[in-house]
Swiss-Prot record:
GO BP annotations listed: cell wall organization; peptidoglycan-protein cross-linking; regulation of cell shape; sporulation resulting in formation of a cellular spore
GO molecular function per UniProt: glycosyltransferase activity; peptidoglycan L,D-transpeptidase activity
Segments forming domain LysM: 2-46
Subunit structure and binding partners: Monomer.
Species: Bacillus licheniformis (strain ATCC 14580 / DSM 13 / JCM 2505 / CCUG 7422 / NBRC 12200 / NCIMB 9375 / NCTC 10341 / NRRL NRS-1264 / Gibson 46)
GO cellular component, one term: spore wall
Lineage: Bacteria, Bacillati, Bacillota, Bacilli, Bacillales
PROSITE patterns for this protein: LD_TPASE (PS52029), LYSM (PS51782)
Domain annotation L,D-TPase catalytic: ranges: 57-164
Name of the protein described by the UniProt record: Putative L,D-transpeptidase YkuD
Classification via Gene3D superfamilies: L,D-transpeptidase catalytic domain-like, LysM domain
Amino acid sequence: MLMYQVKPGETLESIAADFRTTRQALLQANPGLNGGQVSAGQSIIIPGIRNPDTIPYRIAVSLNGRTLRLYERDRLVKTYPIAVGKILTQTPRGEFVIVNRQPNPGGPFGAYWLSLSKQHYGIHGTNNPSSIGKAVSRGCIRMHNRDVLELASIVPNGTRVSITP
């Protein structure tokens, strides 16, 4: 199970939304929560998400470099070109985990969707391959379909994703 440190301004409801779970599931996993109140710096259990420290893979996204790097332990496995958010809808920076996945999600998301632990954001394919390498998305990380399919076949849910400028 994932141990999560509450950030300033977060509530149990916002954490539940980010991790695609319910307030009730969080309360059941954390019986010591007083009335469901959380405070910044507090550690809580996120049920159903594997601990990233038990996963040999991690993903490092460079927004300025427009690259996604896949590591196995500390060894670089592969670097993929990506598209990122445009100025008005920037890709969020920070530490996230993959919380769920959906093959063939429909719409503009290409062949695969990997949800990040921030509601409405993910790593996905594209129906517009010429967009790769540009700042054109609404904040998601966009990959060539063949690349997102390859990535999804390697990394499990719970994989750590670091997004830096």
